[in-house]
Structures are given as structure tokens and as C-alpha cells.
């Protein structure tokens, strides 16, 4: 049995619903460029960071929730008025954050295993 629950969502509305459904739990969210039918993201940094983030999940506390969120296609993401930028202050992908706290890793920080591990293991 997994020590944590993983939820995969696409878009801001699904992300918001997932957060509401897991209210009261510690939530980590990973924001990444959406993948095409072949499973390839338009965001090269996201492709590089994903295995580092996946490895870091070994350090997540029991009972936490990990939300894997695809932010949409590149034109939507680049719009300064998209919901992720306006409502969550997520301004770059990849971004890994502990929801409801100022703790977050942005872009190249998501490639640093020690930082990812630290984010997941802090209480």
C-alpha cells in the first residue's frame, strides 16, 4: 500500500476540486506542461524534472496527497491571466510546492534531488 495518495489532474478547475476533496491533509502539488497523446510534454525542463520529483516521493510523509497537475498547452500557460498565475502565483513550470505554505521549488530547483527531498520530508 502506498504511503501517500496520488491524484492526476489537468487544468485549474480539476486542481481546485482535488484540493477541496483533500482538505485537511498535507498537499504537495507538481505543476508541469501538459503532455501530448504520445506522453511528451511541451516543457523540456518538466521532462527532466519528473524523474527527480518521482524519486523524491520516496521521502513524502505518510498520509500526504501528491497532486500531479498538467497546466495546459503552451499558449494557455503563457497567458499572464491564466488561473494558475492569477490564483496560485505559479509563474513557471515545473513548479513543486507544499500547498498553503510559501515552500516551493521552481524550474531548475526541481532538478536538484536534495531540494526535492527536503521539501517532501519537512513537516
Swiss-Prot record:
<feature type="disulfide bond" description="Redox-active">
    <location>
        <begin position="43"/>
        <end position="46"/>
    </location>
</feature>
<dbReference type="GO" id="GO:0047134">
    <property type="term" value="F:protein-disulfide reductase [NAD(P)H] activity"/>
</dbReference>
<comment type="subunit">
    <text>Interacts with TRXR1 and DYNLL1/DNCL1.</text>
</comment>
<dbReference type="GO" id="GO:0033209">
    <property type="term" value="P:tumor necrosis factor-mediated signaling pathway"/>
</dbReference>
<comment type="function">
    <text>Disulfide reductase. May participate in various redox reactions through the reversible oxidation of its active center dithiol to a disulfide and catalyze dithiol-disulfide exchange reactions. Modulates TNF-alpha signaling and NF-kappa-B activation. Has peroxidase activity and may contribute to the elimination of cellular hydrogen peroxide.</text>
</comment>
<dbReference type="InterPro" id="IPR036249">
    <property type="entry name" value="Thioredoxin-like_sf"/>
</dbReference>
<dbReference type="GO" id="GO:0005829">
    <property type="term" value="C:cytosol"/>
</dbReference>
<feature type="domain" description="Thioredoxin">
    <location>
        <begin position="41"/>
        <end position="123"/>
    </location>
</feature>
<dbReference type="GO" id="GO:0070062">
    <property type="term" value="C:extracellular exosome"/>
</dbReference>
<keyword id="KW-0007">Acetylation</keyword>
<comment type="similarity">
    <text>Belongs to the thioredoxin family.</text>
</comment>
<protein>
    <recommendedName>
        <fullName>Thioredoxin domain-containing protein 17</fullName>
    </recommendedName>
</protein>
<feature type="modified residue" description="N-acetylalanine">
    <location>
        <position position="2"/>
    </location>
</feature>
<keyword id="KW-1015">Disulfide bond</keyword>
<dbReference type="InterPro" id="IPR010357">
    <property type="entry name" value="TXNDC17_dom"/>
</dbReference>
<feature type="active site" description="Nucleophile">
    <location>
        <position position="43"/>
    </location>
</feature>
<dbReference type="GO" id="GO:0004601">
    <property type="term" value="F:peroxidase activity"/>
</dbReference>
<feature type="site" description="Contributes to redox potential value">
    <location>
        <position position="44"/>
    </location>
</feature>
<feature type="active site" description="Nucleophile">
    <location>
        <position position="46"/>
    </location>
</feature>
<feature type="site" description="Contributes to redox potential value">
    <location>
        <position position="45"/>
    </location>
</feature>
<dbReference type="InterPro" id="IPR045108">
    <property type="entry name" value="TXNDC17-like"/>
</dbReference>
<keyword id="KW-0963">Cytoplasm</keyword>
<dbReference type="Pfam" id="PF06110">
    <property type="entry name" value="TXD17-like_Trx"/>
</dbReference>
<keyword id="KW-0676">Redox-active center</keyword>
Amino acid at each position: 500500500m502506498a504511503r501517500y495518495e496520488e491524484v492526476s489532474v489537468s487544468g485549474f478547475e480539476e486542481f481546485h476540486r482535488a484540493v477541496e476533496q483533500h482538505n485537511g491533509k498535507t498537499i504537495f502539488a507538481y505543476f508541469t506542461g501538459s503532455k501530448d497523446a504520445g506522453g511528451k510534454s511541451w516543457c523540456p525542463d518538466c521532462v527532466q524534472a519528473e524523474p527527480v520529483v518521482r524519486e523524491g516521493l520516496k521521502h513524502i510523509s505518510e498520509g500526504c496527497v501528491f497532486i500531479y497537475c498538467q497546466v495546459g498547452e503552451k499558449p494557455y500557460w503563457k497567458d499572464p491571466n491564466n488561473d494558475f498565475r492569477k490564483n496560485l502565483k505559479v509563474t513557471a513550470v515545473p513548479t513543486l510546492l507544499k500547498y498553503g505554505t510559501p515552500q516551493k521549488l521552481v524550474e531548475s530547483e526541481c532538478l536538484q534531488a536534495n531540494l526535492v527531498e527536503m521539501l517532501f520530508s519537512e513537516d
